[in-house]
Amino acid sequence: MQKKKVLVWETLATVSGGQKMTLAVMDMLSDKFEFCCLIPAEGMMSEELKKRNIPYVLMGDQTLPTGVKGKQVIFRYGWMSVKNVWKSLGVIRKYKPDILYAPGPAALPWSAVCGTLARKPVIWHLHHIFLDGATKKLLNLCGNWKSVREIIAVSNCVGDQIVNEAAHKKVKVLYNPVDVEKYANGDATKIIVELEAKLGRKLRGVKVVTQIGAITKNKRQNVLISVIADLRNLGEDVVGLVVGDTITEADRNFKRELEQRIEDCGIKNQIVWMGFRSDIGDILAATDCVFVPSEEGLSLVAMEAMSAKRQVVTMNSSGAYELLNHAGCGTFYKEDDESSVANAVKKVLETPNACLLYTSPSPRD
């Protein structure tokens, strides 16, 4: 039986949570479907595709700032859209896909346009909470088109952004799957040895708070730094791990701001930059609390943390909060209430058995 062909849009060259999910989807469906990916450039994503023998086409830079979009960004997106739709139509004519699949946020409207012009069914996979009103309006408009057959949302709070009545009928909420075994049996020892070497001290009795994700403003690593500083001022011996790295020049500027903030707070010996890592299971095993301060549709990191029997602290307006209500594994703080953030983390660190579904002691106690 001939496999159906799927053309996949990905707008990042790296591999973060969304790209992990795209790769997982392709892995799970590889026996029934063939895939071809549209990606911006060579990088971590292209390396993963090569491992799977999945063909890809380079589309050029598709980087846009997160959050509310100004006029300059809107004009840039308009020009970027023209170029990408034109090039994508060329790929469609050559590859002849049966289905267009768009998990990359910038590519959602492009796939709807291409699906309409090429008469191909489109599936959207929404991972994000869109902070920009213009973006929400555009997605509700395009989501109503006949070419968009299904809209998969990773959480209810993501799906609820599609308010157009006809478009909302296409929404199906499917929580992202996670390989529990991959994260449930990590080796904490080697990470602790690495941290002790970097910090030049033993970590027995020290609590570790970890944030995982690309270093960028919408991930809010600045909140983690504030939490570590606040806990230090409260007399807590805590180390913060920043797992991930920068992608764009704006990200690199943000990281420099974070480094200056760390210097100003006097906590250089309490923050460890871990960079991009593949041994997340081991890092989680060495962690007491996973911190998710970003407003995301559904944090894959939170799911991985729960698989590793680690508690999660997140704010009360994210997909991770929705997940927390189901799993009961951790606690939350009020959005924009700075005083409650450190208290939430402190509560988790002081009550390691508060996790309703899982209990696991600190690897250093």
Residue spans for each PLM region:
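Conserved donor-binding/catalytic core segment of Leloir-type glycosyltransferases
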Residues: 6-7, 202-219, 225-228, 241
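Short, structured helix-loop element that forms part of the nucleotide-activated donor/catalytic region
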Residues: 44-50, 241-268
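Short His-centered aromatic/hydrophobic patch
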Residues: 84, 102-108, 126
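Carbohydrate-associated surface elements
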Residues: 157, 177
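Active-site donor-binding acidic/aromatic loop of nucleotide-activated sugar
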Residues: 249-255, 268-276, 283, 295, ...
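Conserved acidic donor-binding segment of nucleotide-sugar-dependent glycosyltransferases
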Residues: 292, 326-327, 331-338, 347-353
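Short hydrophobic beta-strand element within catalytic cores of glycosyltransferases
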Residues: 311-314
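Conserved small/polar residues in nucleotide/adenosyl-binding loops
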Residues: 358-365
